[in-house]
Amino acid sequence: MANSAQARKRARQSLKARAHNASLRTAYRTAVKKVIKAVEAGDKAAAQAQLVTSTSIMDRIADKGVFHKNKASRQKSRLSAAIKAMA
C-alpha cells in the first residue's frame, strides 16, 4: 500500500485513468467489430459509414495516448483495405 500522500494520490488517479481508458478501448473494439460485421455482411455502404465513425474513435484514442498512433493507422488501413476488396 502507498505510504506517502503523493503515492496515495497517484494510486487514486491511476485507478480513475484505468477505468476511463478501459471504456475507451471498449468503444474502439465495438467500432471495429461493427465495420467487420458490415464487411462480412457484404454491405459496402454501411461498412464505409461505420469506418468513418471508427476512424474518428481511433484517432481520438490515439491522441489521448491509450494506444500508439501507428496502431490506429494500421487498423484504419486494414479496415479500409477490407472494404475496398469487397468489389
UniProtKB/Swiss-Prot annotation:
Biased composition range(s): Basic residues: 7-19
GO biological process: translation
GO cellular component: cytosol; small ribosomal subunit
Residue ranges, annotated region (Disordered): 1-22
UniProt keyword Glycoprotein present: no
Gene3D superfamilies: Ribosomal protein S20
Keywords recorded for this protein, A-Z: Ribonucleoprotein, Ribosomal protein, RNA-binding, rRNA-binding
GO MF annotations, alphabetized: small ribosomal subunit rRNA binding; structural constituent of ribosome
Similarity annotation: Belongs to the bacterial ribosomal protein bS20 family.
UniProt function note: Binds directly to 16S ribosomal RNA.
NCBIfam families on file: S20
HAMAP family linked to this entry: Ribosomal_bS20 (MF_00500)
The protein's name in its UniProt record: Small ribosomal subunit protein bS20
Source organism: Laribacter hongkongensis (strain HLHK9)
Encoding gene (name): rpsT
